Amino acid sequence: MAVPPTYADLGKSARDVFTKGYGFGLIKLDLKTKSENGLEFTSSGSANTETTKVTGSLETKYRWTEYGLTFTEKWNTDNTLGTEITVEDQLARGLKLTFDSSFSPNTGKKNAKIKTGYKREHINLGCDVDFDIAGPSIRGALVLGYEGWLAGYQMNFETAKSRVTQSNFAVGYKTDEFQLHTNVNDGTEFGGSIYQKVNKKLETAVNLAWTAGNSNTRFGIAAKYQIDPDACFSAKVNNSSLIGLGYTQTLKPGIKLTLSALLDGKNVNAGGHKLGLGLEFQA
């Protein structure tokens, strides 16, 4: 088996079917460009149709591949500045080190994180240290894989409280066309998902979740159909009768249009449905 995914990426294929291709209640514009010297620019802006709030972000990234270095600068409309420096496969094969910092001039709030990751065949290990004012917190994660089977554990330890504040466990099975994922968070939240690639054009997913002490089970099914190389259609529905529809069309190379709608199946004629529009430019 190849290198297993990180803990955060367990069950990602099913989540992507449920989340990608939708943008309910938003008008969104994304722009990605890359200069000749390898400098990447990514800017994003969105407007919420209900609150009319407009948000935006700008990111620049430069990869110094000779030394395995990546430099990233970030800014958003909350006036938060971020810097990220990553070095990969230099100190040891499979080892990734990241220094991530952010600063908000308006509030004076500062934050710094050191992230480490190590991946080899059958194992993916990560440890992050968040230097918060209240006291550092340590987040660790481990995923083991063997012949398609995956098992992972994630924990968060807060030094200020001197105790583990989060403990999550996951088990799954993965092939190229099928994925099964189950997880337990803090012993109270339970979830599971199934991903199936039916053929080259059709992907389906099912997810369910419930909380201890609550009899309500959350359930949903989703599908994505690739109509042709330039267009795809997505649909999903949950047990609350919320129906999501999405359509993505590549207008020309580097220009992609996304239309989406969220309908309340219990009150189709009552209004209150959400629409979304997205444009992505890449050069």
From Swiss-Prot:
<feature type="cross-link" description="Glycyl lysine isopeptide (Lys-Gly) (interchain with G-Cter in ubiquitin)">
    <location>
        <position position="274"/>
    </location>
</feature>
<feature type="transmembrane region" description="Beta stranded">
    <location>
        <begin position="189"/>
        <end position="198"/>
    </location>
</feature>
<feature type="cross-link" description="Glycyl lysine isopeptide (Lys-Gly) (interchain with G-Cter in ubiquitin); alternate">
    <location>
        <position position="109"/>
    </location>
</feature>
<feature type="transmembrane region" description="Beta stranded">
    <location>
        <begin position="242"/>
        <end position="251"/>
    </location>
</feature>
<feature type="cross-link" description="Glycyl lysine isopeptide (Lys-Gly) (interchain with G-Cter in ubiquitin)">
    <location>
        <position position="12"/>
    </location>
</feature>
<dbReference type="GO" id="GO:0005244">
    <property type="term" value="F:voltage-gated monoatomic ion channel activity"/>
</dbReference>
<keyword id="KW-0520">NAD</keyword>
<keyword id="KW-0472">Membrane</keyword>
<comment type="function">
    <text>Catalyzes the scrambling of phospholipids across the outer mitochondrial membrane; the mechanism is unrelated to channel activity and is capable of translocating both anionic and zwitterionic phospholipids.</text>
</comment>
<feature type="binding site">
    <location>
        <begin position="260"/>
        <end position="264"/>
    </location>
    <ligand>
        <name>NAD(+)</name>
    </ligand>
</feature>
<keyword id="KW-0007">Acetylation</keyword>
<feature type="cross-link" description="Glycyl lysine isopeptide (Lys-Gly) (interchain with G-Cter in ubiquitin)">
    <location>
        <position position="161"/>
    </location>
</feature>
<keyword id="KW-0626">Porin</keyword>
<feature type="modified residue" description="N6-acetyllysine; alternate">
    <location>
        <position position="20"/>
    </location>
</feature>
<dbReference type="InterPro" id="IPR027246">
    <property type="entry name" value="Porin_Euk/Tom40"/>
</dbReference>
<keyword id="KW-0446">Lipid-binding</keyword>
<feature type="site" description="Involved in ceramide and phosphatidylcholine binding. Critical for channel structural stability and gating">
    <location>
        <position position="73"/>
    </location>
</feature>
<dbReference type="Pfam" id="PF01459">
    <property type="entry name" value="Porin_3"/>
</dbReference>
<dbReference type="GO" id="GO:0036444">
    <property type="term" value="P:calcium import into the mitochondrion"/>
</dbReference>
<feature type="modified residue" description="Phosphoserine">
    <location>
        <position position="13"/>
    </location>
</feature>
<dbReference type="InterPro" id="IPR001925">
    <property type="entry name" value="Porin_Euk"/>
</dbReference>
<feature type="modified residue" description="N-acetylalanine">
    <location>
        <position position="2"/>
    </location>
</feature>
<keyword id="KW-0547">Nucleotide-binding</keyword>
<feature type="modified residue" description="Phosphoserine">
    <location>
        <position position="240"/>
    </location>
</feature>
<keyword id="KW-1000">Mitochondrion outer membrane</keyword>
<dbReference type="GO" id="GO:0005741">
    <property type="term" value="C:mitochondrial outer membrane"/>
</dbReference>
<feature type="transmembrane region" description="Beta stranded">
    <location>
        <begin position="123"/>
        <end position="130"/>
    </location>
</feature>
<feature type="cross-link" description="Glycyl lysine isopeptide (Lys-Gly) (interchain with G-Cter in ubiquitin); alternate">
    <location>
        <position position="20"/>
    </location>
</feature>
<keyword id="KW-0053">Apoptosis</keyword>
<feature type="transmembrane region" description="Beta stranded">
    <location>
        <begin position="39"/>
        <end position="47"/>
    </location>
</feature>
<feature type="binding site">
    <location>
        <begin position="242"/>
        <end position="244"/>
    </location>
    <ligand>
        <name>NAD(+)</name>
    </ligand>
</feature>
<keyword id="KW-0813">Transport</keyword>
<keyword id="KW-1003">Cell membrane</keyword>
<protein>
    <recommendedName>
        <fullName>Non-selective voltage-gated ion channel VDAC1</fullName>
    </recommendedName>
</protein>
<feature type="binding site">
    <location>
        <position position="20"/>
    </location>
    <ligand>
        <name>ATP</name>
    </ligand>
</feature>
<feature type="transmembrane region" description="Beta stranded">
    <location>
        <begin position="178"/>
        <end position="185"/>
    </location>
</feature>
<keyword id="KW-0597">Phosphoprotein</keyword>
<dbReference type="GO" id="GO:0022832">
    <property type="term" value="F:voltage-gated channel activity"/>
</dbReference>
<feature type="cross-link" description="Glycyl lysine isopeptide (Lys-Gly) (interchain with G-Cter in ubiquitin)">
    <location>
        <position position="53"/>
    </location>
</feature>
<dbReference type="GO" id="GO:0006869">
    <property type="term" value="P:lipid transport"/>
</dbReference>
<dbReference type="GO" id="GO:0008142">
    <property type="term" value="F:oxysterol binding"/>
</dbReference>
<comment type="subunit">
    <text>Homodimer and homotrimer; in response to cyclic AMP or calcium; oligomerization is required for scramblase activity. Component of the mitochondrial permeability transition pore complex (mPTPC), at least composed of SPG7, VDAC1 and PPIF. Interacts with SPG7, NIPSNAP2 and SLC25A30. Interacts with hexokinases including HK1. The HK1-VDAC1 complex interacts with ATF2. Interacts with BCL2L1. Interacts with BAK1. Interacts with RTL10/BOP (via BH3 domain). Interacts with amyloid-beta and APP; induces VDAC1 dephosphorylation. Interacts with TMEM41B. Interacts with BCAP31.</text>
</comment>
